[in-house]
Amino acid sequence: MRKFVAIVLLLLCGSCALAQRSYILADGDKKDADYQKGKSQQVGLDLGLTVLANRIPIENMMAGSKPSKHLLREGPLHLQLPMDDNQTDFAVYHSEVFDRKSSINILQIDNELIVYRTMETTGNIHLLYQCTRGAYGTKKSAHAKNAPVYRLWDTPERCLLPDLELQDQMAKSEAKKCGKTDYPLLIFNDLKSYGYGEQGDEAIAHFLDTMQKYNPGKRLQADLLTPASQTYLSQVNENQLWNESMRTKIVETLSEQQDYYRTKGMPWMIGNFQIHLADKYRKATTLEELEWFLSKAAAFDAGFGLDFSAATMRQHGLTDTLLGTIKLWEQLRMNGAFSEEQKEAFKDPYGNWHIEQADSSYLIYPQYVSRRYPCHFEDDSWIWDSPYAGPFALRIAVEGKGSISGLSLRTPNGTITFPCTLKAGQYLIYDFDGSAWITDLNFNKLEEVIAQGAAVLNEGETEVTFSCEVQKEKGVLPRVTLRYITKGDWAEKNPH
């Protein structure tokens, strides 16, 4: 039987002073951000403000009927043939500017903007089709052969980028706004876009210098480390969003990233984790998912960004539990309480861990979280294969339409029944201590259930049978899934 249980004493040690504090990403609305701030302070996290100071909405790019002279452009390219004012297909000579993906596909010829829909490359010619002439209020015009053609820089948000002169003005304005806030951390994603012009890395440094000038004492974070930016940045977060489906892929790359930033002497953040509500695409974030991520942050001794909106905080039934768990893991990480052996164990991409406080020490033990088992309502039987023997927790979800009642789960070691009705859009949550609750799909408690009987699982394979009564709605059966959780042995509490 695999056993790994640890007792960790919380030791305050000065050698860990360089550990980076994690943070919650602030909402744009001030009222919501203030709500987040209160929650973040309770658990010892910073509140970070994401700053995008070089985005120009398309509706703001015009100077009368002419494009602004301060838009960032690539080129020039040149027209292969003359073009009249109604022509919607035309050709330009080859240029590497078309190697960059674009979200809007805007070209500028003199004072006319043209949006092309498709492009085909033949030899040294780019053929542009289904073009909108006189786009965004500009005037359609005829253009001569070899007329210069420019491609405007755009972003995935369908915004345009400024030239260096306008970027400096925008940076100064945004820096002054940030200086009036009390956010301790300013976050710059897509930092490379500040250096797309001819100035390159120097433009990035100039931008960060402006932000620092008006925000002394605040930490600056970006998603990219460059020679010029290193002087200004307090930490780097490459903005990788973690989720359960990417377990192995993400963890495999972390050691290389950690080594790279260590050689640069730059504190490194492990990425971002989103706590979200249930929707038609995803189930609400669980405690087990969060602790899996927290164990990886502990494994690499790295802080992280937490995408936990005020709306989600207000509606998620486990908000206080999730924040309290973050506080425990982060206290231990920040104070260097995890041993190297524990960190190596945490790096297992499939490993799940749970932490609880016990007086002045903390108990950490491994968990096994099963896949979801679909029910077919014909005395469903499965072989559950758990690395740990003993009690187990259950998560039974009902979705779609209809309901189930008279739930019963039988193992060779006993039977547990749940005298309740579980409707579509609800969970039955059964925990290790025998407590059971009906919740909504965001884990808000609706009704307590008194479970009857007891059962345990073997180490290794156990045959399990689940049965219930099914109530259709408009002839449609509900969709029911089960997931079980087991845990390793507790360690004896350290008497010191």
Report residues per predicted region.
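Short conserved beta-strand and strand-loop elements enriched in small hydrophobics
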Residues: 103-111, 149, 409, 463-467
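Autoprocessing Asn-cyclization modules and mimics
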Residues: 49, 53-133, 137-140
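Intrinsically disordered, low-complexity segments enriched in serine, threonine, and glycine
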Residues: 92-94, 118, 133-145, 382-496
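Carbohydrate-binding surfaces of carbohydrate-active enzymes
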Residues: 43, 72-76, 296, 300-396
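Chitinase-like catalytic core of GlcNAc-active glycosidases
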Residues: 151-180, 198-206, 214-216
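Glycan-recognition surfaces
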Residues: 22-34, 59-74, 155-169, 212-313
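Sec-dependent N-terminal signal peptides
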Residues: 4-13
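Aromatic-lined carbohydrate-binding surfaces of glycoside hydrolases
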Residues: 20, 31, 35-78, 135, ...
